[in-house]
Amino acid sequence: MNLAQLRAQQIPVESEPRAAAPFHLLVKPIGAGCNLGCRYCYYPQRQQERTRKMDDDLLAEFIRGYIAAQPRYSREINFVWQGGEPLLAGIGFYKRALALQRRYAPPGVRISNSLQTNGTLLNDAWCRLFRQHHFILGVSLDGDREVQDAHRPDKRGGASYDAALRGIALLQRHQIDFNLLMVVHDGVADRAEAIYDHAVAIGARYLQFQPLMLEGDAPTAGYGLSAANWGRFMLAVYRRWRSRGHIGQVFVMNIEQVYAQYFTHVSPSCVHAERCGGNLVMEPDGRLYACDHLINAQHLLGHADRHTPLATLAARAAEMPFGKNKSLRRECQRCSVKSVCQGGCPAHVGEDRYNRLCAGYYAFFSALLAPLRAYPRSPQGAMQWRAAVSATAG
């Protein structure tokens, strides 16, 4: 029996190559399909209209291949589900995915799942599934009613805030932790404190702020984000977080990333990693790309439903110039915040080879690094810093 026949039977084969290092793959089972009509969405409307759901054969081949491609020493394999709105794939789709994960998971390997949703379609059945299988949930909510309904309406232009809040309340009722993802653009740049306060008021303990950067040909007229506004917004969040005494109580991923990267030399975010290319994305038809922000022919790696193993496709992504040349510019090399910035996301680099948010990152990172520089960049340094912070808080 040859390799193609074994794949057809969905049997893991030891002869398949494994990746040299763990890699992540973000899956879009419904592609651009969504029940909201966010005014800044980077998916063109025509792409949202022609999307289709991933079929069961491709789902099975992907799960089998993704598990088989990870290094033998991997002790956890994470599946990331995103959209569009991934809940549109239906609860049965994820039940099948979970069954396939159990079927192909090697002994001693933990399988985990993360899913990003707008929260409006959540119900008790979804929450029971997520709770039972320990899903890590992200919920997209840009702010209070005024902000959310203005920038993230439904397909008919109507309000979405109440539906999103109902979804969040369900997660809390089922005792499911969630990360609140908020998009930052010039239209909300002067509302950082109010947006932070609202997130905390609705019970969110894990927050993440994502800069809006226009990509492709999406109809995002009137939206943008200047470097100055990005830096101003994040500095305001940082100061609010400190002034309210939320250290150790509310976790802002943009802040935690700096702390982690300073003391461990490793970034939890591909945006600020020294190299990227280890976070692939798969469309519902099986096309694999090197990055969620680089969905174009230049960064197409291949197809998951064809005969090239995923480990081989992942190796191609790791060797692409965009991931290796992030911070090679002379200005980056001598920048005082390079250790936690690393040039930012390559998709946000302009024709002048500067990251369009450079000045904002510099202002934000400089403020966070100032009190850290007195401590060694080591686990021991982290312990000393935490002790000092605790003493001050006490």
Where do the protein language model's features map onto the residues?
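N-terminal [4Fe-4S]-dependent radical SAM core
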Residues: M1-V27, R72-Y73
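Canonical Radical SAM [4Fe-4S] cluster-binding loop centered on the CxxxCxxC motif
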Residues: A20-D57
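Cysteine-centered iron-sulfur cluster-binding motifs in ferredoxin-type domains/subunits
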Residues: I30-G37, E85-L88, C276, C332-R334, ...
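Radical SAM/AdoMet-radical enzyme domain recognition
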Residues: I63-V80, A89-L212
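Radical SAM enzyme [4Fe-4S]-AdoMet core and its adjacent flexible, acidic
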Residues: A150, D154-D162, A169-C276, V281, ...
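Short, ordered coil/turn segments that flank beta-strands lining enzyme active or ligand-binding pockets
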Residues: P284
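Flexible mid-to-C-terminal extensions adjoining Fe-S/redox cofactors in radical SAM and related proteins
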Residues: I295-G394
